[in-house]
Amino acid sequence: MYTGWLKSFKVGREFTPEERSAELHKACSIDAAPAQRLGLISINSTFVDWIDRRFLYRGMLNTSVFLIGAFGFIWLFLFLATSLPDNAPLFSLVYIFALFVTISPFAASFFLYALWLRREFFCHVYYPIRFNRKTRKIYVFREKRDGGLLIVPWDKVFFHIGRGTDMKFLRDIRGEILDGEIVKDTFALGHCAERDEPVKEMWEFIRRYMEEGPEAVAEHPLDKYVELSVAPTWKNCLISAVGFTNATTPFKRVLLFPFIGTFTVVRWLVFKSCKQPVFPPEVEAECQVEPNDPHIWPIPNSIGEFVTTVPGLMAYAMRKAQGIKTPPDVPGDLASQFKDWGKK
């Protein structure tokens, strides 16, 4: 989960047979229905932007622990700094020991920042991976320290189901740039999962878009909306924290409130210190969108907004989750709401 984020993917290595056997094919459909799985940021006739793997984990458990630890060490440093003995000789053992004890917490807080927090704060809110079906290119937005912007042809990337380095039960979509059997670069996209099916569903969405067009990714008119919101708002941070803690019932939410509250605040602080990702002008020039593009899907202000506000959409989503097909001739006023939102 943290490879490619806290530590870089290994490059210059030999591509393994296990990775090759887990290939996600571009030309043929797989046994999975296309699904966003909260991975789609935006879509139109020219490109889709997909979320990076780390997004849902930003500001959560590890970051909260490290941040609270850093603040605790700073507080301890200030407390000890005001407690240095005034009457001890400057180079006495007592003074040196007191100085060492005082500086240690400050050094520890700096270590926590260098180890983890610098990867969270003062970076970017998210790191989109853009798939342009007209230029047949992929644009991977990355920090300069991680190699900077990667632009690579769609047909030159080997995609497969990646596995976690430490948490081997986790899967994700992994893109490999190969030179023969040697890995030259690697990137991951979409949220990780504990099963292959969610990963395959995200891949089928991307594959259909690039190979068949935007009309192929939605099997029903009521599927044509974006589920995810990347806006760094309190509400989105709270929704993400509830999802991260798996607080699916009111009882769980009350029980886990200290964690939910902490994660919400820390995630909000992380995002407020970060800036929005902006692709270079030359990339945007290749990704022009027509003003009246019929395949621009509406984007919610908060995660899951449309399901809770559009009449009938919750029932449709529940039927879909149960595998129940819904006829495409839905009431006109219900289907048209997405069409109207897309023009706003």
What are these regions (language model features)?
Residues 1-39:
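Short, non-transmembrane cytosolic segments of multipass membrane proteins
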Residues 128, 146-152, 182-186:
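Short, mixed charged/polar active-site loops
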Residues 158, 166-227:
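A membrane-cytosol interface segment of integral membrane proteins
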Residues 41-45, 213-245:
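Juxtamembrane amphipathic/hinge helix adjacent to a transmembrane helix
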Residues 49-125, 233-344:
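Alpha-helical transmembrane spans
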Residues 36-57, 173:
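Short, hydrophobic/proline-enriched secondary-structure or compact coil segments at domain edges
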Residues 128-143:
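Membrane-cytosol interface motif
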Residues 137-138, 147-166:
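Phosphoinositide-dependent membrane-docking surfaces
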